[in-house]
Amino acid sequence: DMKVPNNGTIIGDDKNPGNMKDQAETGDYKNTSILSISLKDGERFYGGGSTSRDHIQHRGELLRMWTTYQHTEIPMPFMISSENWGIFNNTTRKNFFDIGNYQSDVFSIYNTTDEVDFYLMFGNSMPDVINYYTAITGRPYLLPKYAYGLCFGPNMLEDQFDILNDAVRFREMGVPCDLFWLEPQWMEKRYDFSTKKKWNYQKFSAEAYWDSTRYPKKENHRLLIGRLHGMGYHMGLWLCIEYDLSVPEEDALAKAMGKPLSGQEHWMDHLKNFVDNGVDGFKMDPARTIDEHPNFKYYNGHTDKEMHNLNQILLPKQMYKMMREHTGLRSWHHYTAGWSGTQHWSASTSGDNGGGRTALFDQLNLGMSGFLNTSCDVMNVNKDEELQSLHFGLFLPWVQINSWYSLHQPFYFPEK
């Protein structure tokens, strides 16, 4: 499994000015709250999202509910008991689940605020409880049919001719691939967080370079995306985002109430140009939405204490709404991070953690937390585990093979 890079930033995001963190881990103890529940002997607990990568049964563990790169990308403050009840701690602030860790017969939820808002759910079975939980936080997103086939990400040094060659050879070999996506090399500026990004016309001709300033955009059947569509493939693009996601939410509220809007741009809007070029969906990288911004004040007046975990819902929600409103269709899009509710807006992966043991625990824990569309970077494992990881990946709800810096095309492997 992949490890956290030494500089503490997201893999590939080399020019991050600094991944700052809020050093107040548990908040002001005078303004905190603890909810405690007595436990029965032998009672077991499941859920919590991707907060534990050692167990799927969490009694005896202390779980930290805070979205953190390569540690807890999709924490979900929800737990199910083998006694057919569950609890959802309805907050976006940092909180902790002590499930019989400090006291073996007590389940304590520690909130870094003096407010407590939770749901208790009782059912005839554990699936009943999950069903109640997703009734509150949102039913899992349904991807388009093609997204449940094989999604393949070529090496980030490949240009359009390499990718078209991959596409042709996949068809010749009978590889049932439905989607290719491009890593950061598709952008003119590497890791372009702005709303002014352009195609890297030196490598990719989704449109003629002389059309770069012409609007509206359209798909050209003679160029890259048109040719891939002609062979039965769909096309996705990698994205990185660092933006105040509260702006579109506040504008939506203001519009509904007949109040003035912010006048600020909405980050998702510029992606419509690429969709008009024929792009079918987007892979949302954790850079830098998953980073902490402790000194930033959001447009809605809040800080990262409330917004950090909430951002992991707002990003895929705003992607879903933009794509649905612009195309009228469900789209292929996924995001590494999450919180309770993200499952309603997007698919997910296990992030930059490979396709081995860590990914396996993530899939199981997320599944027990009502998150349906999960996957991982299949085959990003040690050499002797590659085919095992492929077999594992093909049994996931959706499957992606992410070459990124590797060469995972089947024709590069030995025949036996």
Name what the model sees in each region.
Residues I136-G153, L239, L245-A256:
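N-terminal small/glycine-rich loop or linker at the start of catalytic domains
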Residues D159-D162, N311:
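Short amphipathic alpha-helical segments
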